[in-house]
Amino acid sequence: CIVYPNDAFDALTVLQTVQAEKCTGLHGVPTMFIAELDHPDFAKYDLSTLRTGIMAGSPCPIEVMKRVQADMNMAEVTIAYGMTETSPVSCQSSTDTPLDKRVSTVGLVQPHLEIKIIDPDSGQTVPRGATGELCTKGYSVMQGYWGDDARTREAIDAEGFMHTGDLATMDDEGYVNIVGRIKDMVIRGGENVYPREIEEFLYRHPQIQDVQVVGVPDQKFGEELCAWIIAKPGQTLDEAGVREFCKGKIAHYKVPRYLKFVDAFPMTITGKIQKFRIRELMQEELGLSEQKTA
C-alpha cells in the first residue's frame, strides 16, 4: 500500500510515518531527503524497515545518495530521470545496479525507449563519455503542447526525438549521468562551467546541507558563479571557510565569486528549486544586468 504522511511535505511527519507504518520504500525529491536527514530529531526515529525508494525530480547529489543509503537504511534506493513531457521516466537505476553506478548515474534507458546524446549545435551524436543534449524517443513522449505547434516543433524533431534541454553523458555500459541544463551552463571567460559539478563538490563540505550554483552577469568575464548555501542545523558558515575548502581542490575559475547564505531556496509547490529565481534575485541584489552581445 502507499502511505501519504500529509497533504504537504514536512520532514518530521515523514520520519514519524515511516516508523509508525514500518514503510519499506520512500520516494521524494533531493531537497526532501536532505530535510529528513538533517532534521534535529532524525536519530530518534527507527527507519530500519526501509529498504528502497526513488529519488527524482531534480539532480540527485551523489553525497546525498550515499547518506540516504547509509543513514536511512535504503540500500536499494534508485534514481529516476525524465520530464513531464516524457510521461515522465526515461532512465532509471534498479535495485541491483552496482552501488557506484546507483549513486552517480540515473541508470539505463527504460525498455522500449530510445535515447541519444547530441551536440546541441550540430545535432550529431557525440562519442561515449562526451557531454551533449539528451534526447529521448518512444511511446512515452507526448504528442505535443496543447495549442502550441511552434513550441512542439522546437521540442520534438522530425525523427520523433524529444529534446530535453538537459546535458548528459553516457558511459560504455550505457549508464547516463545528468551534467546540468543547457540554460544553466555558465560561460566564464570562455570556459564552460557546469553548476552541477560545483554543487557536487560543495556537498562534501561537512557543514553544508544544501547548495545551488547559478551564473550571473559579469562585465569582465561575461558570467560569474554564485552559490546559495544552506548550512546544516546548528552550524555557522562564512565566505572565508568555504573558499578555503575550495582552495587547491577545484580550478580557481570554478570557485564561486559570490556566496550567499540562506535559510531556504525559492521552490515550486512540488519541491523543485527555481534556479531562475535565484539568478534574478542575485542580479537585483548585486545590481547586475545582462550584457548585450552580437
Where are the model-predicted features located?
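Beta-strand->loop->alpha-helix junctions that form or flank phosphate-binding loops
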Residues: V77-E85, T105-V109, V214-V216, K260
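Glycine-centered tight turns that cap/initiate beta-strands
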Residues: D41, T49, N73, H112, ...
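AMP-binding/adenylate-forming catalytic core of the ANL superfamily
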Residues: V18, L26-V29, E133, G138, ...
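Gly/Ser/Thr-rich phosphate-binding loop
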Residues: L15, A20-G28, L37-K101, E114
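Active-site glycine-centered loops adjacent to acidic/histidine catalytic or metal-binding residues
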Residues: G57, G82, G107, G138, ...
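Acidic/polar alpha-helix N-cap and adjacent early helical turns
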Residues: E280-A294
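Adenylate-forming AMP-binding core of the ANL superfamily, especially NRPS adenylation
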Residues: P59, L99-G147, A155
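A short helix-loop-beta submotif of the ANL/AMP-binding
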Residues: C1-V3, T24
